[in-house]
Amino acid sequence: ILDKYTTKKILVMEYIDGIPITNIEHLKKHNLNLKVLSENGVRIFLKQVFQDNFFHADMHPGNIFASKESPEKPFYYAVDYAICGSLTESNQILLAQMISCLLERDFFSLAQLFIFADWVKEDTKTEELESVLRANCESLLDKPLSQILFGELLLNLFDGMKQFDLYLDNDLVLLVKTLIHIEGMGRQIYPDLDFWSVAQPF
């Protein structure tokens, strides 16, 4: 925002000369490294979540642009920060444990985790929840890790929990929605995006 020119009636912001992130034709025309671009998108968001603990929660394609500068090391412009999120420390830990349980196929511990977190109704039986989570997610985990769609896995996971009165904090809902957007955009830019390899350091 350019304060010098902004008044009560007029909001003046700098002009961003970027390429809409899903305009693949223009990204290629400017010789942007699409693999690096897609991987950096995942890194940027995960850094916001796990290191900065303040994330842009409205990262749909209309709010994300790619810079035309340094095509081999492309970077992003993100606009419209009207919706942002921040996780409590306990939810950060729970999220990391949830992903770990999924990758290890430890559905019993995953069920215990959800009950402990009060994400399901209090009379939920661990064995019943474990069975549903396994039925919804195990087949997706049979693929090589690089081919597992994180967004699809999360949707199946939470779909199975609906019958147990799934409840998530607003910031967790924002996080899940944004993660799905990020992975989807990343794979649209570079279909062979390996979300898990990029996410591993976090």
Task: Annotate each language-model stretch with its function.
Residues 1-202:
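Conserved catalytic cores of large enzyme domains
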